[in-house]
Amino acid sequence: MDAPATASRQPIAEEPRMSQESSLSTVSTTSLVFDRLHEHNEKSYHSSSQRRRAPSASRGGYADHPDDDDDDDESYKEADTNDLETGPFLAPASVMMRRVGVDRGLKKVILILAAAFLFAWGAALFVFLSNKSYKHASTIDHDPSATSRGSGKPVTLDQVISGFWYPTSHSISWIEGPNGEDGLLLEQGARGKDYLVVEDVRSGNKDSQVSANVVQSRTLMKNPWINVGGRQLAPSDTRPSKDMKKVLVSTDRQRNWRYSYTALYWIFDVETQTAEALDPEHPDGRVQLATWSPQSNAIVFTRDNNLFLRKLDGDKKVTQITNDGGPEYFYGIPDWVYEEEVFATNSATWYSEDGKYVAFLRTNETGVPEYPLQYFLSRPSGKEKPPGEETYPDEKRIKYPRAGSHNPVVDLLFFDVERGDVFSVDIDGGFADDDRLINMVLWANDKVLIKETNRVSDIMRVVLVDVVARTGKTVNTIDVGELDGGWFEISHTTQFIPADPANGRPQDGYIDTVVHGNGDHIAYFSPMDNAEPVYLTGGDWEVDDGPSAVDLKNNLVYFVATKESSIQRHVYSVHLNRSDLKPFTDTKFESYYDISFSSGAGYALLSYQGPKIPWQKVVSTPSSPVSYEHVVEKNEDLAENAKKYELPILNYGTLKVDGVELNYVERRPPHFDEKKKYPVLFQQYSGPGSQSVHKKFAVDFQSYVASALGYLVVTVDGRGTGFIGRKNRVLIRDHLGYWEAHDQIAAAQAWAAKKYVDPARIAIWGWSYGGFNTLKTLEMDAGRTFSYGMAVAPVTDWRFYDSIYTERYMRTPQLNPSGYDQTAVSNVSALAGNVRWLMMHGVGDDNVHYQNTLTLLDKLDLNGIENYDVHVFPDSDHGIYFHGANRIVYDKLSNWLINAFNGEWLKVAGAKPIVEPKARV
């Protein structure tokens, strides 16, 4: 069978581990010894004729200190570059050696012994090779759990940036059949097939038991284009109706924000293979969102922020549902902050299963302040400047609610398709308009379950609305701030469980992720208004994705959790009555899995993401009556590359800080030697609930630094991050940046005490929240542990960031003024205590505004602080890509770090002019 759906090369965030398939063979050991003999001889030769000053732990004790006038022997430097770990990127300390004369007789004895040794070694090598025991390192499978590496090439920065090391992955567009058939997928653009085809995932399998139940494939679109009015248009996206008689096709898509876009929409008829405009009277009207009715008889869509309905009953008339949509009123779609922080999608429209009602969000941005984004080279507004004004920058103004400012006012409205009217349902005891966040909307037959919180996200109301009776009530109120001082995270995995008395489900219910004990677990609420659930999971571990799927026939709930280890992920199932919790994946091996289930949960795309080379399979689940397995991706090319290149040695462990066990991964250079003194780069993100230490396979920038530059790279997930217990997560509330920085400093102090670490050369870096915590760490440490730092797109004051994210962790500036003062990067005198640091930012960043960097620069100017470098990128957003900027970011990080660890930045402070260059001898 062809690989289902679309293959893509996806970056995966971390380095892996592999099972210990094979230890070092005799030959690889011999190779290592041979390499070290050569290395020893070469170094001994140069050290006998060259004096080098060993650095002390003090600031002035760098090997490349500007006062080291005797470090000018070019022959030494040239030879030294052959060792990646002591070459141009790493200036090692050497001990002083004296030349000792040797008499001729002793020389003769030494030569005879050397000749005998070489003869014996050659004979042993001949026997060794003749026994065919030799295996070159490039033929040995990559083992991420290995404690040493063989020979190979270093990882390059070009490879990391180009995607050379990205595992190939596939996604499946699972689709439910018109009659509820399970295991169907949507194939688009598959080689040798029609353009859009519905396939049974088991098609092509020769097993008679499997093939007997395969649903016949069905072509929806033959060609990779549609003809409209004599024009051939290429689809940007395709969405079949549930009955598979029509396809909603979008063309000419234009991006707006992270998830949102506008496009032209067309209705494609499968039988006639013809297309017509979604709105025949406005065929070129750009649509923001279009959604099928579950009954396949209508499409609801948003255009110009108003909601419309197109019925497919032969009448091509379009009904306008709302009329006052515009720049400040949105219907059926989220505004910027709800798209970014709440729904993580471009949709705020929800159809009832019977197609009789449409729930949609109304967003009023009238009171939300605007933030101007300036573009100096591009014109994202699409507006041409009038003659004579072409040199002025383009400007895009977005309604961006910052912490403490006015939030958009949101309401949930309903459209009765049969009556044609819009209505709302008032609920007693609700949050005030400026204090209400609507986080989730879920249809449950003719009822709607709504989760809303106050704006600081520590009180939740669960509301149940009866759309037929047009009434509603609050069924549960939870004050988690009172419970543990924490907050509610937004979840989109809540699933409706319809009643089935014959199958042990007497009433409707739902499954949700809830706070239970010291973490996130899944619970079953039934009936719908029950506030006391059955907890399906519990214990000293957490559910990461749940419910991932529900098999209603067998009452099985699938989920992904950290039950084996906080840095692993396995898939499990549990019965709705809480019995029979068992793993679906093999838990005997360290693994990190992701999974995508078919509509009926009978099949799944199982993605193994590490620590070995990633692979993917389509498999049957315990819910399927027939066993099935098909390998989709082996990543054989990646496996071959991993054999040929020297990937870092991965050392996983835990570090105890203030009694809390923190996960870490230490990436060591391929030929790590505990007798050497290594610089250390700490890389972290540190954001609330995030995780950077895990068992995924990844070869990334950190891998390049360890492999090619020869530095140690350490990642420690400090308090505030995810999956180390809720108590350790919510500790950071009201003072972001304090415990995160504290734990990075504690980790750096632990590494500085190690014998193989040069304590004078320790740096830290991060992007976004990681950039913020880099600066907070440098500020708190004031140069006592960290010498250098690199911050990309950092927040420097949380009063500048969006309200929904910030207030969840900090509450409002009005409620927590001292917290905001303390969390801002403001102690610039402490920053002056570091040797040097780097800051980079995109001028067109719509997420973390460039104002963050400019404000910090002004504080530095006011205090005369100059020990930093800045690089800004015009027109780049938070990802920094405009005009090849992303490559420049990583080039800058790499080169800046090399200069830092080579001691070059020590020469910048107090620089003195050289009137006449020093003559070379």
UniProtKB/Swiss-Prot annotation:
Its EC number is 3.4.14.5. One of its GO terms (biological process) is proteolysis. Disulfide bonds: none annotated. Keywords: Aminopeptidase, Glycoprotein, Hydrolase, Membrane, Protease, Serine protease, Signal-anchor, Transmembrane, Transmembrane helix, Vacuole. The chain crosses the membrane at residues 109-129. The keyword Protease applies. The keyword Transmembrane helix applies. Its main location: membrane. It comes from the Eukaryota. InterPro entries: AB_hydrolase_fold (IPR029058), Peptidase_S9_cat (IPR001375), Peptidase_S9B_N (IPR002469), Serine_Prot_S9B/DPPIV (IPR050278). Residues 66-75 have a biased composition (Acidic residues). GO terms for molecular function: aminopeptidase activity; dipeptidyl-peptidase activity; serine-type peptidase activity. Belongs to the peptidase S9B family. This is Probable dipeptidyl-aminopeptidase B. It comes from Colletotrichum graminicola (strain M1.001 / M2 / FGSC 10212) (Maize anthracnose fungus). The lineage of its organism: Eukaryota, Fungi, Dikarya, Ascomycota, Pezizomycotina. The gene is DAPB.
